[in-house]
Amino acid sequence: MGNGVQPLDPVAIQIGSISVKWYGVIIASAVVIALLLALSEANKRKMDKEIIVDLLIWAIPISIISARIYYVIFEWDFYKNNLGEIVKIWHGGIAIYGALIGAVLTAIIFSRIKKISFWQLADVVAPSLIIAQAIGRWGNFMNQEAHGAETTRSFLESLHLPDFIINQMYIDGAYYQPTFLYESLWNVLGFIVLLIIRRTKIRRGELFLGYVIWYSFGRFFIEGMRTDSLMWGDFRVSQVLSLLLIVLSIGIIIYRRMKMNPPYYMEDKFGKVVKKK
C-alpha cells in the first residue's frame, strides 16, 4: 500500500485453503462474553441459567438471518439483479438494527413459551447486548468498514489514537473517520451507565429500555458521520429508526409507570438484585 502504511491482516488463522478472519473471531468472542455476562445477571435475579442458554441457541441464528434480511431490503436495487448474493452473507452485509429486531422478537416469543416475563428477561440481557456491540465493532475495524468520511492523518493523531488504529483507517489512499471506534466507546460508556442506573429505583424492563435509548441516541449522531449508510429515499434508515426507538422507549416507560405499575429492582451493596414494590 502507498504512503508506507500497512493495514492489519484480516485473517487470524490460515490452514491450507481455509482461513479464519479476525471478524469472525471477534464476533464469536463478543457472543461468548455476552453469554457469560448474561449468566451472571441471571444468577443475580435468581433466573434459571438454562433459560439464557436456550434463548441464545434460538436468538443467534434468527438474529443473523434478520440482520441479513434487513440489509437486503434496503439494498434491494442491487440484490434484485443478483439474487444469488442474498445468501452469501460471508461477502458482507448485515445490520445491527436488523439483528436487534430479530433478537427482540425471538425473546418475546421465547418468553411466552417459557411463561416468563419478557421484561425481566430483557433486563438480564441488556448489559450483554451493549457490551457485545462494543466488542463487535472491532470486527468492522479489522475489515476496514463502517468508517466515516475522509479526514487527515493529522486529525487522527490529534485524537491521540495509537498508530495501529490510524494506519487501519488508511483505505485506498485516504484516511477516514474511525466511526467504529466512536460507537464502540459509546457502547462501553453505555455499559457503565447501565451498571450505575440499575442501582437506582428502576422498574422492570427499564434497564433494557434504557439500553435502547442510550444506543439509539449515540447511533443517530454516529450514523450521520458514516459513508455506507443504508438509505430510505433521502433519509438514513438507522437515523430514522433511532428516533423512532427513542420515542417508543420513552413512551413505553411513561405508559407502564402510569398504567401498569411494574415492580422495580435495585442492587444491594453486594451486587445482588433485590425486587421490591
UniProtKB/Swiss-Prot annotation:
GO CC terms of this entry: plasma membrane
Uppermost EC category: transferase
Record-listed a 1,2-diacyl-sn-glycero-3-phospho-(1'-sn-glycerol) binding positions: 137
Protein EC: 2.5.1.145
Pathway the protein takes part in: Protein modification; lipoprotein biosynthesis (diacylglyceryl transfer)
PROSITE patterns hit by this protein: LGT
TM helices/strands, residue ranges: 18-38, 51-71, 89-109, 116-136, 177-197, 205-225, 235-255
InterPro entries: Lgt (IPR001640)
Principal subcellular localisation of the protein: membrane
Location(s), subcellular: Cell membrane
One biological process term in Gene Ontology: lipoprotein biosynthetic process
Bilayer topology term: Multi-pass membrane protein
Function: Catalyzes the transfer of the diacylglyceryl group from phosphatidylglycerol to the sulfhydryl group of the N-terminal cysteine of a prolipoprotein, the first step in the formation of mature lipoproteins.
Name recorded for this polypeptide: Phosphatidylglycerol--prolipoprotein diacylglyceryl transferase
Organism: Listeria monocytogenes serotype 4b (strain CLIP80459)
Lineage: Bacteria, Bacillati, Bacillota, Bacilli, Bacillales
